[in-house]
């Protein structure tokens, strides 16, 4: 998870000022073969996602340059622009950080970067999830409340601003709970191994459980519920219109109550939601399993853990491909 750590790193009954914990060399992590494969695939996905998302942003920029009379981007293109920015931010922070951390195994960047990068990591994970909520809400309102949407031209931009603001606020606790710890031998002397973890940040075990559940809910459960509800309302509304007058949904006609372009954006929204759900569900299910059964880490192999994480990283790669497919 975004703020998870190993059981040894999450002891609650300890001094908050303690910066070293007793570990043995046998407990130290190492870069295994599966870890090397994870690093290789992570950097490959980093290049792929950066290329796809940067290309889409460049395409939007060129499109605005060609527009005549200073016309602005459509609302859907503005939403896609911010989703792409969020995906690019996640790509540029999460993927290199994970890849380099797996190579070095321990943390060399110091206390300040431990806190700042932990904050930026969670911020960059919140942003795409919240932007998916904004897109789903906007498309749902466009179908179910079209007059209200037209009368409030600033609604979309307000939701976008709120998504970025909440992402920055909800990631704030990372600056407090993450810190550097050092390996200590039996005599209490540090042995040069350091790590960036949440050790001693939570006075009681349930404090950490609550925070983990909060981040899990904001990153996955709440966005998923919003997307399901919004898409269900869209389907219900379209089904009702179809039953009232089947000719209203004939795509081959130029004059439709629901134009072909709008139906295409609706399909694209559903595809975005499907990509988000399929890519992230295995990763978060594994995280929930670990909360209820910490010994699970000893039963699930490292390659499986690595696969679920890498599968989640496909999401920012898929989004620009989805837009490209529906733009053909």
UniProtKB/Swiss-Prot annotation:
Disulfide bonds join 114-196. Residues 60-84, 137-157, 230-271, 328 are cytoplasmic. One of its GO terms (molecular function) is gonadotropin-releasing hormone receptor activity. Receptor for gonadotropin releasing hormone (GnRH) that mediates the action of GnRH to stimulate the secretion of the gonadotropic hormones luteinizing hormone (LH) and follicle-stimulating hormone (FSH). This receptor mediates its action by association with G-proteins that activate a phosphatidylinositol-calcium second messenger system. GO terms for cellular component: plasma membrane. Keywords: Cell membrane, Disulfide bond, G-protein coupled receptor, Glycoprotein, Membrane, Receptor, Transducer, Transmembrane, Transmembrane helix. This is Gonadotropin-releasing hormone receptor. Belongs to the G-protein coupled receptor 1 family. Glycans are attached at residue 18. It is found in: Cell membrane. InterPro entries: GPCR_Rhodpsn (IPR000276), GPCR_Rhodpsn_7TM (IPR017452), GphnRH_fam_rcpt (IPR001658). It is a multi-pass membrane protein. Residues 1-38, 106-115, 179-208, 293-306 are extracellular. It holds the Pfam family 7tm_1. One of its GO terms (biological process) is cellular response to hormone stimulus. It comes from the Eukaryota. The chain crosses the membrane at residues 39-59, 85-105, 116-136, 158-178, 209-229, 272-292, 307-327.
């Amino acid at each position: 998870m975004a703020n998870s750590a190993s059981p040894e790193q999450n002891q609650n009954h300890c001094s908050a000022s303690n910066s070293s914990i007793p570990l043995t060399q046998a407990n130290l992590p190492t870069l295994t073969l599966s870890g090397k494969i994870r690093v290789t695939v992570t950097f490959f996905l980093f290049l792929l996602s950066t290329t796809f998302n940067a290309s889409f942003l460049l395409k939007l920029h060129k499109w605005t340059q060609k527009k005549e009379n200073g016309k602005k981007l459509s609302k859907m293109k503005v939403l896609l622009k911010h989703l792409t920015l969020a995906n690019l931010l996640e790509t540029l922070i999460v993927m290199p950080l994970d890849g380099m951390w797996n190579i070095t195994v321990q943390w060399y960047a110091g206390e300040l970067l431990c806190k700042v990068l932990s904050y930026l990591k969670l911020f960059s994970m919140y942003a795409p999830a919240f932007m998916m909520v904004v897109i789903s809400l906007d498309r749902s309102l466009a179908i179910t409340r079209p007059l209200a949407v037209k009368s409030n031209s600033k609604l979309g931009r307000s939701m976008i601003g709120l998504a970025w603001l909440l992402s920055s606020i909800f990631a704030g606790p990372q600056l407090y709970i993450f810190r550097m710890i050092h390996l200590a031998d039996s005599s209490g002397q540090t042995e040069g191994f350091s790590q960036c973890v949440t050790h001693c940040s939570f006075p009681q075990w349930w404090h950490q459980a609550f925070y983990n559940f909060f981040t899990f809910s904001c990153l996955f459960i709440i966005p998923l519920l919003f997307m399901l509800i919004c898409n269900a309302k869209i389907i219900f509304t379209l089904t009702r219109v179809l039953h009232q007058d089947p000719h209203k949904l004939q795509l081959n006609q130029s004059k439709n109550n629901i134009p072909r372009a709008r139906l295409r954006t609706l399909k694209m929204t559903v595809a975005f939601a499907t990509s988000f759900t399929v890519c992230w569900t295995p990763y978060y299910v594994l995280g929930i399993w670990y909360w209820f059964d910490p010994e699970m880490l000893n039963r699930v192999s490292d390659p499986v853990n690595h696969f679920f994480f890498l599968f989640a990283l496909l999401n920012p790669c898929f989004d620009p491909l989805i837009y490209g497919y529906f733009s053909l």
